[in-house]
């Protein structure tokens, strides 16, 4: 379910493998209350990131150049390139002049499946849902999630306050999405940011896969709308709750129903809307 660009030709950077910055400062003209001011402004970086499996480039996407190991692992899991984290043997980050190549060494069985997918796409042009060869694969139905998660709605709402305070790149630039993991005890234990909401969730998925967190009892929080792809990636994580600050799409609601995922949107202080499987969210008030 990835959206990616055509792969550009990249050349090793002469300056070495220094990690790119996540944001840069620009001189801007700022108009406020009838006055024009010149001031510095922090702007989020996005760079082409190529995911290379066993030496073969599979996809190139624009992403924030941070937590790329998490991104590569989470993307590989959520896209079904590997079925478990242990199928990824090694991840190396190769910074180049025109982007970043993430080199992944994966199990031979997973690589053979990936090559079969690539052969089915040979000769096609354009890149909408790259790596997806049929409508049936786009609309794949994951197995129902088994989760014993249970949260009071006050905990979910308070967690978004925690998340807002921990979005460092967003505070600098105002341009990034975040995905976070909420533990059963109400603590936001992991936060990942990116200019793309799908990328942020893939980064969280990768971090969770190597963290030892109890997936069955936690929840995914996102600072974006809840699209079909966000629900699908939540199902790949195995989480039973997805809470978003914005609305879901109708397709996302239908998928959440089928995948047994509690889907909440418009989460605010003192308010939220539950679209699917409300049994995992507890509150004192009775239905009006």
Curated annotation (Swiss-Prot):
Instruction: Give the matching InterPro entries.
Output: Cytidine_deaminase-like (IPR016193), FdhD (IPR003786)
- What induces or represses expression of this protein, per its UniProt record? Induced by formate.
Lineage: superkingdom: Bacteria
What is annotated as the active site? Answer: 127
Pfam families cross-referenced by the UniProt entry: FdhD-NarQ
| Assigned GO CC terms | cytoplasm
**Which subcellular locations apply to this protein?**
Cytoplasm
Parts forming coiled coils: none
| Principal location class | cytoplasm
Q: Which UniProt keywords apply?
A: Cytoplasm, Molybdenum cofactor biosynthesis
Say yes or no: keyword Nucleus present: no
Q: Where is this region: Disordered?
A: 1-23
Q: Example GO molecular function term?
A: sulfurtransferase activity
The answer on whether this UniProt entry bears the keyword Cytoplasm reads: yes
Gene Ontology biological-process entries: Mo-molybdopterin cofactor biosynthetic process
Against NCBIfam families, the record matches this protein to: fdhD_narQ
What the record says about family reads: Belongs to the FdhD family.
Q: What does this protein do?
A: Required for formate dehydrogenase (FDH) activity. Acts as a sulfur carrier protein that transfers sulfur from IscS to the molybdenum cofactor prior to its insertion into FDH.
Query: What is the protein named?
Result: Sulfur carrier protein FdhD
Origin species, per record, is Cupriavidus necator (strain ATCC 17699 / DSM 428 / KCTC 22496 / NCIMB 10442 / H16 / Stanier 337) (Ralstonia eutropha)
């Amino acid at each position: 379910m990835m959206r990616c660009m055509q792969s550009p030709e990249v050349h090793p950077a002469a300056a070495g493998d220094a990690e790119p910055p996540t944001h840069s400062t620009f001189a801007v003209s700022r108009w406020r209350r009838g006055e024009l001011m010149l001031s510095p402004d922090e702007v989020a970086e996005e760079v082409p990131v190529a995911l290379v499996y066993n030496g073969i480039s599979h996809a190139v996407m624009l992403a924030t150049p941070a937590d790329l190991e998490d991104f590569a692992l989470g993307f590989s899991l959520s896209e079904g390139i590997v079925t478990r984290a242990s199928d990824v043997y090694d991840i190396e980050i190769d910074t180049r002049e025109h982007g970043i190549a993430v080199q992944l060494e994966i199990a031979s069985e997973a690589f053979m499946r990936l090559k079969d997918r690539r052969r089915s796409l040979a000769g096609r042009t354009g890149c909408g849902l790259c790596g997806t060869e049929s409508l049936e694969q786009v609309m794949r139905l994951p197995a129902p999630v088994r989760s014993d998660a249970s949260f009071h709605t006050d905990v979910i709402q308070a967690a978004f306050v925690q998340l807002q305070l921990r979005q460092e790149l967003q505070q600098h630039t105002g341009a990034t999405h975040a995905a976070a993991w909420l533990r059963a005890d109400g603590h936001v234990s992991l936060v990942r940011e990116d200019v793309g909401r799908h990328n942020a969730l893939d980064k969280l998925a990768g971090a969770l896969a190597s963290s030892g967190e109890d997936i069955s009892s936690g929840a995914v929080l996102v600072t974006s709308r809840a699209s079909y792809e966000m629900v699908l990636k939540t199902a790949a994580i195995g989480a039973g709750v997805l809470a978003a600050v914005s609305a879901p799409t109708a397709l996302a609601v239908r998928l959440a129903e089928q995948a047994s995922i509690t889907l909440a949107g418009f989460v605010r202080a003192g308010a939220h809307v539950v679209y699917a499987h409300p049994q995992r969210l507890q509150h004192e008030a009775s239905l009006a």
